[in-house]
Amino acid sequence: MAAAQARAVVEAVTRAHPGRVIISTSGQIVDQPGSPLQAPADSPIMTLIDGVTDSGVPTAVVAPRLYLENLLLPVVLGPVREEGVLRYPLPASFPVSWSSHLDVAEVVARLLTDASPTTGTVGVGHLPGLTGPDLAAAFSNHLGREVRFEGITPEAFGELITPLFGPAAAPVVELYRALNAQDGNTIAEDGSAQELLGLRPRSIGQWLEDLAVS
Protein backbone atom coordinates (compact mmCIF):
# COMPACT_ATOMS: atom_id res chain seq x y z
CA MET A 1 0.00 0.00 0.00
CA ALA A 2 1.31 3.43 -0.97
CA ALA A 3 0.98 6.50 1.23
CA ALA A 4 -1.60 8.03 -1.11
CA GLN A 5 -3.73 4.90 -0.87
CA ALA A 6 -3.53 4.95 2.92
CA ARG A 7 -4.65 8.57 3.03
CA ALA A 8 -7.51 7.83 0.63
CA VAL A 9 -8.76 5.02 2.85
CA VAL A 10 -8.55 7.25 5.92
CA GLU A 11 -10.57 9.94 4.14
CA ALA A 12 -13.19 7.41 3.03
CA VAL A 13 -13.57 5.97 6.52
CA THR A 14 -13.80 9.43 8.06
CA ARG A 15 -16.57 10.42 5.65
CA ALA A 16 -18.54 7.16 5.73
CA HIS A 17 -18.04 6.49 9.46
CA PRO A 18 -18.87 2.75 9.35
CA GLY A 19 -19.70 0.80 12.48
CA ARG A 20 -16.21 -0.68 12.73
CA VAL A 21 -13.03 -1.13 10.70
CA ILE A 22 -10.58 -4.03 10.67
CA ILE A 23 -7.05 -3.46 9.34
CA SER A 24 -4.61 -6.29 8.63
CA THR A 25 -0.91 -5.48 8.78
CA SER A 26 -0.05 -8.46 6.53
CA GLY A 27 2.98 -9.19 8.67
CA GLN A 28 4.30 -5.67 9.13
CA ILE A 29 5.13 -5.09 12.78
CA VAL A 30 3.17 -2.25 14.35
CA ASP A 31 3.01 -3.27 18.00
CA GLN A 32 6.66 -3.23 19.10
CA PRO A 33 7.60 0.45 19.57
CA GLY A 34 11.33 0.84 19.93
CA SER A 35 12.08 -2.37 18.05
CA PRO A 36 14.12 -2.16 14.82
CA LEU A 37 11.32 -4.19 13.24
CA GLN A 38 8.61 -1.64 14.06
CA ALA A 39 7.09 0.05 11.00
CA PRO A 40 8.18 3.72 10.84
CA ALA A 41 5.67 6.28 12.05
CA ASP A 42 5.42 7.77 8.54
CA SER A 43 5.00 4.42 6.77
CA PRO A 44 1.77 3.77 4.83
CA ILE A 45 0.58 1.13 7.30
CA MET A 46 1.06 3.44 10.30
CA THR A 47 -0.54 6.33 8.40
CA LEU A 48 -3.53 4.07 7.78
CA ILE A 49 -3.78 2.79 11.35
CA ASP A 50 -3.32 6.19 13.00
CA GLY A 51 -5.67 7.95 10.60
CA VAL A 52 -8.50 5.44 10.86
CA THR A 53 -8.12 5.22 14.64
CA ASP A 54 -8.22 9.01 14.93
CA SER A 55 -11.45 9.08 12.88
CA GLY A 56 -13.34 7.83 15.92
CA VAL A 57 -14.52 4.64 14.21
CA PRO A 58 -13.94 1.54 16.39
CA THR A 59 -10.81 0.03 14.85
CA ALA A 60 -9.07 -3.30 15.33
CA VAL A 61 -5.66 -4.05 13.87
CA VAL A 62 -4.97 -7.69 13.02
CA ALA A 63 -1.24 -8.26 13.35
CA PRO A 64 0.15 -11.59 12.13
CA ARG A 65 3.88 -12.22 11.79
CA LEU A 66 5.00 -14.70 9.11
CA TYR A 67 2.52 -16.60 6.96
CA LEU A 68 2.69 -20.38 6.70
CA GLU A 69 1.80 -20.00 3.04
CA ASN A 70 5.39 -18.82 2.51
CA LEU A 71 6.34 -22.46 2.96
CA LEU A 72 4.30 -23.37 -0.12
CA LEU A 73 6.57 -21.43 -2.48
CA PRO A 74 7.95 -23.85 -5.08
CA VAL A 75 11.51 -23.06 -3.97
CA VAL A 76 10.60 -24.07 -0.41
CA LEU A 77 8.10 -26.90 -0.87
CA GLY A 78 9.97 -28.45 -3.79
CA PRO A 79 13.04 -29.42 -1.72
CA VAL A 80 10.74 -30.67 1.07
CA ARG A 81 9.19 -33.11 -1.38
CA GLU A 82 12.29 -34.01 -3.34
CA GLU A 83 15.08 -33.90 -0.75
CA GLY A 84 13.36 -34.01 2.63
CA VAL A 85 14.83 -30.61 3.46
CA LEU A 86 12.90 -27.51 4.55
CA ARG A 87 15.14 -24.56 3.70
CA TYR A 88 14.20 -21.13 5.02
CA PRO A 89 16.15 -17.92 5.71
CA LEU A 90 16.02 -18.06 9.51
CA PRO A 91 18.21 -19.73 12.15
CA ALA A 92 16.95 -23.11 13.32
CA SER A 93 16.32 -21.83 16.86
CA PHE A 94 14.50 -18.65 15.76
CA PRO A 95 10.92 -18.66 17.18
CA VAL A 96 8.12 -17.26 15.05
CA SER A 97 4.41 -16.77 15.71
CA TRP A 98 3.51 -18.43 12.42
CA SER A 99 -0.09 -18.23 11.21
CA SER A 100 -1.98 -19.04 8.05
CA HIS A 101 -4.29 -16.89 5.97
CA LEU A 102 -7.06 -19.16 7.28
CA ASP A 103 -6.22 -18.17 10.86
CA VAL A 104 -6.23 -14.49 9.98
CA ALA A 105 -9.57 -14.86 8.20
CA GLU A 106 -11.12 -16.43 11.29
CA VAL A 107 -9.90 -13.58 13.47
CA VAL A 108 -11.18 -10.95 11.04
CA ALA A 109 -14.57 -12.67 10.80
CA ARG A 110 -14.88 -12.71 14.59
CA LEU A 111 -13.90 -9.05 14.87
CA LEU A 112 -16.46 -8.08 12.24
CA THR A 113 -19.34 -10.03 13.76
CA ASP A 114 -18.87 -9.84 17.54
CA ALA A 115 -21.70 -7.94 19.19
CA SER A 116 -19.26 -5.57 20.89
CA PRO A 117 -16.39 -4.24 18.76
CA THR A 118 -12.88 -5.15 19.87
CA THR A 119 -10.42 -2.32 19.37
CA GLY A 120 -6.65 -2.09 19.39
CA THR A 121 -4.11 -4.57 18.09
CA VAL A 122 -4.82 -8.29 17.98
CA GLY A 123 -1.76 -10.46 17.41
CA VAL A 124 -2.27 -13.63 15.38
CA GLY A 125 0.07 -16.60 15.51
CA HIS A 126 1.47 -19.48 17.50
CA LEU A 127 2.49 -19.06 21.13
CA PRO A 128 5.06 -20.05 22.04
CA GLY A 129 6.70 -19.35 18.72
CA LEU A 130 7.61 -22.25 16.45
CA THR A 131 11.16 -22.93 15.29
CA GLY A 132 12.43 -24.38 12.04
CA PRO A 133 12.70 -27.92 13.46
CA ASP A 134 9.10 -27.60 14.72
CA LEU A 135 7.97 -26.89 11.16
CA ALA A 136 10.06 -29.72 9.75
CA ALA A 137 8.62 -32.17 12.29
CA ALA A 138 5.09 -31.21 11.28
CA PHE A 139 5.92 -31.78 7.61
CA SER A 140 7.49 -35.14 8.55
CA ASN A 141 4.37 -36.25 10.38
CA HIS A 142 2.08 -35.10 7.59
CA LEU A 143 4.07 -36.53 4.69
CA GLY A 144 5.08 -39.72 6.45
CA ARG A 145 8.79 -39.31 5.76
CA GLU A 146 11.70 -37.52 7.36
CA VAL A 147 12.02 -33.79 6.76
CA ARG A 148 14.79 -31.77 8.35
CA PHE A 149 15.19 -28.01 8.64
CA GLU A 150 18.09 -26.12 7.11
CA GLY A 151 18.58 -22.43 7.74
CA ILE A 152 19.88 -20.49 4.75
CA THR A 153 21.01 -16.90 4.38
CA PRO A 154 18.62 -14.17 3.24
CA GLU A 155 20.89 -13.67 0.22
CA ALA A 156 20.61 -17.33 -0.76
CA PHE A 157 16.84 -17.12 -0.38
CA GLY A 158 16.86 -14.02 -2.56
CA GLU A 159 18.60 -15.94 -5.33
CA LEU A 160 15.88 -18.58 -5.14
CA ILE A 161 12.92 -16.21 -5.24
CA THR A 162 14.19 -13.59 -7.70
CA PRO A 163 13.11 -15.67 -10.73
CA LEU A 164 9.61 -15.72 -9.20
CA PHE A 165 9.33 -12.18 -7.84
CA GLY A 166 11.79 -10.12 -9.88
CA PRO A 167 12.61 -6.76 -8.23
CA ALA A 168 10.04 -7.48 -5.51
CA ALA A 169 12.49 -10.02 -4.07
CA ALA A 170 14.77 -7.26 -2.76
CA PRO A 171 12.52 -6.08 0.12
CA VAL A 172 11.93 -9.72 1.09
CA VAL A 173 15.68 -10.20 1.45
CA GLU A 174 15.89 -7.02 3.53
CA LEU A 175 13.09 -8.27 5.79
CA TYR A 176 14.92 -11.50 6.52
CA ARG A 177 18.18 -9.68 7.10
CA ALA A 178 16.39 -7.61 9.73
CA LEU A 179 14.79 -10.70 11.27
CA ASN A 180 18.13 -12.50 11.44
CA ALA A 181 19.44 -9.67 13.60
CA GLN A 182 16.72 -10.35 16.20
CA ASP A 183 16.08 -13.17 18.68
CA GLY A 184 12.62 -14.02 17.37
CA ASN A 185 9.44 -12.74 15.75
CA THR A 186 6.57 -13.45 18.11
CA ILE A 187 3.38 -11.77 19.24
CA ALA A 188 2.68 -10.67 22.81
CA GLU A 189 0.47 -13.06 24.74
CA ASP A 190 -1.65 -10.34 26.38
CA GLY A 191 -2.55 -8.88 22.98
CA SER A 192 -3.03 -12.18 21.17
CA ALA A 193 -6.17 -13.57 19.55
CA GLN A 194 -5.84 -16.45 22.01
CA GLU A 195 -6.17 -14.09 24.96
CA LEU A 196 -8.55 -11.48 23.52
CA LEU A 197 -10.87 -13.65 21.41
CA GLY A 198 -10.28 -17.22 22.53
CA LEU A 199 -9.11 -18.13 19.02
CA ARG A 200 -6.03 -20.30 18.52
CA PRO A 201 -4.23 -20.77 15.23
CA ARG A 202 -4.58 -24.24 13.72
CA SER A 203 -1.65 -26.57 14.21
CA ILE A 204 0.85 -26.92 11.37
CA GLY A 205 -0.39 -30.45 10.82
CA GLN A 206 -4.00 -29.28 10.57
CA TRP A 207 -3.00 -26.51 8.18
CA LEU A 208 -1.16 -28.98 5.94
CA GLU A 209 -4.24 -31.21 6.00
CA ASP A 210 -6.64 -28.35 5.30
CA LEU A 211 -4.62 -27.36 2.23
CA ALA A 212 -4.11 -30.99 1.14
CA VAL A 213 -0.35 -30.52 0.89
CA SER A 214 1.30 -33.65 -0.46
Can you describe what each PLM-predicted range is?
Residues P154-S214:
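A hydrophobic C-terminal alpha-helical subdomain
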Residues M1-R7:
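Glycine-rich anion/phosphate-binding loops
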